[in-house]
From Swiss-Prot:
The active site is at residue 105. This is Type III pantothenate kinase. Pfam families: Pan_kinase. Coiled coil: none annotated. Its EC number is 2.7.1.33. Its cofactor is NH4(+); K(+). Keywords: ATP-binding, Coenzyme A biosynthesis, Cytoplasm, Kinase, Nucleotide-binding, Potassium, Transferase. Its main location: cytoplasm. Homodimer. InterPro entries: ATPase_NBD, Type_III_PanK. ATP binds at residues 9-16, 129. It comes from Burkholderia cenocepacia (strain HI2424). Pathway: Cofactor biosynthesis; coenzyme A biosynthesis; CoA from (R)-pantothenate: step 1/5. It is an enzyme of class 2 (transferase).
Length: 265
């Protein structure tokens, strides 16, 4: 029986992981913080030894060192690969002028999306610390993207750089807007700030989607991912699809594609 692959997505806010079997199915998943202060270490005690770890890390050197320590403690000597964007991989062609400048998380997400929705033009919107958009043609060509502050970052910037506006988290804002989003305008400052930043996210997505449909003269599936996707989705007026594992699914494909070359590991 083929050994599984351990997949790790180290984002700007937290670290997600999954174990992928020979069919590239995610059979076990979890999440943990950048530091032990952010939550307990992952419980990998029940997992079999994987063939190797495949890592997307956009969180920096300290997180890379934490991951190395965790992997060495559980599986000493485990091979590991930190992925980078390439010009071409797993059926996706990178349209960046300098392909390696594309974030590894966005690259893995593109690969995951191309496999999840074959033969379709896609606009992929991912809501994390930053909101990112990727335009992906049905033939696998990534033609470019957009990066904007995420919902939480927008609200935090207003709270930090003004004298009278509150600093709100997404949890607080989501609670404030529960049941209130049917109203286009809000009647107090916290809700006005929450809804204004949320509508800024939705407006960006809808404008980008409409521009892409017009440019390509073809249907484009809007795919949402990331922690704030549910909140933004409620503010959208266009059809969309939710997918919560694009990056991990893309990592599974990258690992499987490289497996023959690392069969001796």
């Amino acid at each position: 029986m083929s050994e599984p692959h351990l997949l790790i997505d180290a984002g700007n806010s937290r670290i997600k992981w999954a174990l992928a079997d020979a069919r590239r199915s995610l059979v076990d998943t979890g999440a943990f913080g950048h530091t032990r202060d952010g939550g307990a270490d992952p419980d990998w005690s029940h997992l079999p030894r994987p063939r190797g770890a495949w890592i997307s890390n956009v969180a920096g050197a300290d997180v890379a060192a934490r991951l190395d320590a965790l992997l060495d403690a559980r599986w000493p000597g485990l091979p590991r690969t930190t992925i980078r964007a390439r010009p071409v991989q797993c059926g996706v062609t990178n349209g960046y002028t300098t392909p390696e400048q594309l974030g590894s998380d966005r690259w893995a997400g593109l690969i995951g999306a191309h496999a999840a929705f074959p033969g379709e033009h896609l606009l992929i919107a991912t809501f994390g610390t930053a909101t990112t958009l990727e335009a992906l043609r049905a033939d696998g060509r990534f033609t470019g993207g957009l990066i904007a502050p995420g919902w939480a970052l927008m609200m935090r910037a207003l709270g930090t750089h003004t004298a009278q506006l509150p600093t709100l988290t997404t949890d607080i804002a989501s609670g404030l807007l529960a049941g209130a989003q049917a109203e286009p305008f809000q009647i107090d400052t916290p809700r006005s700030l929450s809804a204004g930043c949320l509508y800024a996210q939705a407006g960006l997505i809808e404008r980008a989607w409409r521009d892409l449909v017009a440019a390509w003269q073809a249907p484009v599936r809007l795919v949402l991912a990331g922690g704030a996707a549910d909140d933004v989705a409620r503010a959208l007026t266009v059809a969309h699809t939710r997918h919560d594992a694009l990056i991990l699914s893309g990592l599974a494909l990258i690992a499987a594609d490289a497996a023959p070359a690392t069969a001796q590991d």
